[in-house]
Amino acid sequence: MSEAKITPSRHSYVKDRLQDSLNRFIKHESFGGVLLAFCVGAAMLVANSSYADMYFTFFHSEFGAFFSDSHFKVSLQDFINDVLMSFFFLLVGLEMKREMLYGELAGFKKVSFSFLAAFGGIICPVMIYSYFNSGTAYESGFGVAMSTDTAFALGLIMLLGDRVPKILKIFLVTLAVADDLGAISVIAIFYSDNINMQWIYASLILVAVLIYLNYRDTKYLSLYFLAGILLWFCVHHSGIHVTIAAVILAMAIPGRTRVNKKYFINMLKEFERMKVATNDWNDVVYARESEKVGFWRGSFKNIRSFIFGNQDVEKKIDMAKTSQLVHMLDTIGTYSRYAQNPLIRLEIALQPICAYFFVPLFAFANAGVTLEGNIDISLNSVMLGTILGLVVGKPVGVLLFCFLGEKLNLATRPKDLNYLHILSVGMISGIGFTMSMFVANLAYKDDIMSIDMSKISILVASSIAAVLGLLVVYLSTIKQDNQLENINEEDEIQKLKETQSII
């Protein structure tokens, strides 16, 4: 078989896998957004009910281990925020790498458009928040106003179903991925303290190990996870936030699919051996046909075979032949695993558990805020900076930087993506929720009042951004429907004129 015939099929296979991965991501994230909204609502209800003390006591309860005079303990909330959410940031890192290697972020002009949009969506909210809080005790909370919750955002646009063009969904995903990269960078730089250089050096050694594993194109994910766990431990003790360890691990996971010619030939040989061993697959067909008998008939046949074994010759099993077939299947499975893309395989495994368990659990553990009457929400600079940053700063920044990037020829706007779409994505990216709450816990640390005020602001801002974003998306799709109707009418008129000219 010639190389020319192999190449298109390989490109088609990779393209199909990437398309399936993107669709699977959108599916998980959209349903995860609905589940996330339920968890936020449940947390708010419980935190303001008679079960509030039980709720807060449960998530602040500590557990750990001890050895001799040494002991280690952590609260359940810290375990969720630092350990379980590391898997979420690992998934974010994998998505970023996939998009930059094969997806909508591949190529400088393409990646620069999404990164410019994300950069604008970071700079403008930070400027607005800093305007209200510069020089105050709350100025460290600027990172709260710049984060996007991808799950909520995708869950929102899925409410409109097929009305939402696919390019809008893809742009939202790539913008959110680039936005997460910016948020992670801000966390690593501005929300890390008491840096311990010895642990930094240990972390750098482990980063070198991960780079070497990637260079050797090691396919065993267990080796990466072992190095990643050690890296997480070192980064945690270094004073830098552990999210950076998860992203570094993601960047080290190989993103190549290498189909070795030797493995491919060996797989074909195993298939030929199975074909011969099963009498040109006839034994397999007969075995499947024999299994199609009913439950009662099959049970009676098995009992009769057990009691009168010599009378049912057909049920005798050739153990040597069966073992040979099992060995062949194991060999084919091994070669198949060698050919799989580790990045996509790990991403597919992490998507459902993050969307359905880790992120909703984080939301339920952190969204519980007690609404007390003595909180002055009308004049608080934290609330004004957060709400205006997310609701106004996000769409203005995204739209402005996309426009400047295209006009200055720094980036290429994707085909079929208009500026009304970009505005709607900017509105939707103002939904902060989990990412903003995550940053709020880091920014205000032990200031419970500021954390609660920030969380209330996030909930209000995200709700406003969701309503406005949904409205703008709907308006943009109405315009698209009208354009399609006009095109169809023009086609009908043209066909009518052609018919009349023929007559």
UniProtKB/Swiss-Prot annotation:
Function: Na(+)/H(+) antiporter that extrudes sodium in exchange for external protons.
Topology of this chain in the membrane: Multi-pass membrane protein
Gene Ontology molecular-function annotations: sodium:proton antiporter activity
Residues annotated as transmembrane: 31-51, 74-94, 112-132, 141-161, 170-190, 195-215, 229-249, 348-368, 384-404, 420-440, 458-478
UniProt-listed InterPro entries: Na/H_antiporter_dom_sf, NhaA
A cellular component term, taken from the record's GO annotations: plasma membrane
One GO BP annotation of this record: regulation of pH
Native source species: Helicobacter hepaticus (strain ATCC 51449 / 3B1)
Protein name listed in UniProt: Na(+)/H(+) antiporter NhaA 1
Gene name, Swiss-Prot/TrEMBL: nhaA1
